[in-house]
Regions:
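Positively charged n-region of N-terminal signal peptides that target proteins for export
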Residues: 1-4
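Sec-dependent N-terminal signal peptides
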Residues: 6-9
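C-terminal motif of bacterial Sec signal peptides marking the signal peptidase cleavage site
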Residues: 14-15
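A eukaryotic "domain-start" boundary segment
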Residues: 20-39, 43-47
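Secondary-structure boundary elements
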Residues: 43-47, 51-176, 212, 266
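His-Asp-centered catalytic microenvironments across diverse enzyme cores
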Residues: 160-161, 194, 205-210, 215, ...
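Cysteine-centered nucleophilic/redox motifs
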Residues: 177-202, 217
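Structured interaction patches on ligand/partner-binding surfaces of diverse proteins
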Residues: 371-396
């Protein structure tokens, strides 16, 4: 009889799925044990797991196991519940999400946060705005193109340095109608995740010439990561910063390119708005950008479609011959309103052969934009033909 009772107890425990309920992989249990041992809300989180529908419970368990301690201690459980429900709904609804490996879905679709922004209820809102727009798409690429193209109009948010803060949440950006490149990237990542497209935040603390930082978005498509940004470039992996990214330095905390991960990686993302923080996990993806730019430059040279354009910045027309006459200035390049590149000109102490150069498409008109010595926006129109070109610009 005792043996029979033990067998019945074991069967009942198996049916219930252990201490956290059915549907949770056995490998998650030690992770949950460790996570819940270190939070005052352990009982509430255990109850949340047991109350979560069985087909959503593994996703909830994964988030609780890996969420930052601060979120585990304070984040709204209703918000966590809604996030999991709509992420799992997207996986059931969209064929591209259903086809994802579990590891990609869990780390690049399911998470409720991108970096260290305020945790708000973005997923349901963005799902309801965007799901009807991608309902007719059969492939991830088409859904990605749709969301990337229409998002600025759908949410009414534009780039503006007057935004309240750098690391804005979607709700904060939509309330103001503006965001920095960081806020725009957070918004695009969340918009893509809302309709089941795997996405993550990427960026660098400083370009190779130290003229500033930048953030953008990576998307997982056809088994590989590619980059885009809030204002959709003409193709994946062809944004205006490609040449700069191609000169990033792997392993250099300031000049490498990192992509964020919700799951711990052993490395961290250098957030310029919170320089002491080590809380956001990341991977160094610099080499992929270097390889992408080298392939682009090699193809352009082989096909003869692009030409090198060098830009020198001098004090004025009377002082434009000696190394000491040169001025270091940030310059952006546009064609038909779309940014094609940017960089910083060589200053007076740099070698005379060190010249800011761009690889630009032939037979096109370009606008070079910079601030002069008086802080005024200056624009220089340059007609690029078939031959390499050196352009001189002046601060006065």
């Amino acid at each position: 009889m005792k043996r029979l009772l033990l067998l019945l107890f074991a069967a009942a425990a198996t049916a219930c799925g252990g201490p956290y309920g059915a549907g949770i992989p056995a490998g998650y249990e030690p992770l949950l044990d460790a996570a819940l041992a270190d939070t005052p809300r352990a009982d509430s989180l255990r109850a949340l797991l047991r109350e979560t529908p069985r087909d959503e419970r593994a996703a909830m368990a994964w988030l609780i196991a890996w969420m930052p301690r601060g979120d585990r201690d304070t984040m709204s459980l209703d918000l966590l519940r809604e996030n999991v429900r709509y992420a799992c709904c997207a996986r059931e609804e969209f064929p591209w999400t259903k086809a994802l490996p579990d590891s990609v879905f869990l780390n690049e679709v399911l998470p409720y946060a991108v970096v260290d922004e305020v945790r708000d209820a973005w997923r349901r809102d963005l799902y309801e705005r965007l799901a009807p727009r991608v309902a007719g798409c059969r492939e991830l690429a088409a859904a990605l193109d749709t969301v990337n193209r229409i998002l600025p109009a759908v949410v009414g948010v534009e780039y503006n340095t007057l935004r309240e803060k750098t690391n804005q949440s979607p709700a904060e950006s939509m309330r103001q109608g503006m965001a920095s490149c960081t806020g725009l990237s957070v918004l695009l990542v969340d918009a893509l995740r809302a309709v089941g497209i795997p996405a993550r935040f990427a960026g660098t603390a400083a370009w190779h010439d130290n003229r500033g930082n930048h953030s953008w978005t990576e998307v997982w498509i056809d088994g590989a990561w590619h980059f885009t940004e809030y204002y959709q470039p003409w193709a994946l992996d062809r944004a205006w910063y490609l040449a700069d990214a191609g000169q990033a330095v792997a392993g250099d905390r300031n000049h490498a390119i990192y992509a964020v991960s919700f799951h711990p990686t052993g490395d961290w993302f250098p957030m310029v708005w919170s320089e002491q923080s080590r809380d956001v996990h990341a991977v160094d993806v610099t080499q992929r950008y270097v390889d992408t730019y080298e392939a682009f430059a090699s193809d352009a040279e082989r096909q003869g479609t692009h030409v090198k354009v060098a830009l020198r910045m001098f004090r004025d027309r009377r002082h434009a011959s000696q190394s000491g006459d040169r001025v270091a200035a940030n310059v952006d390049v546009f064609r038909d309103g779309e940014q094609m590149g940017g960089g910083r000109t060589a200053g007076p102490l740099q070698d005379m052969n060190d010249v800011l150069s761009f690889l630009l498409e032939k037979n096109s008109s370009y606008l070079f934009r910079y601030e002069n010595a008086r802080g005024e926006l200056t624009e220089l129109t340059v007609e690029v033909g078939d031959e390499p070109l050196t352009v001189d610009a002046y601060m006065e």
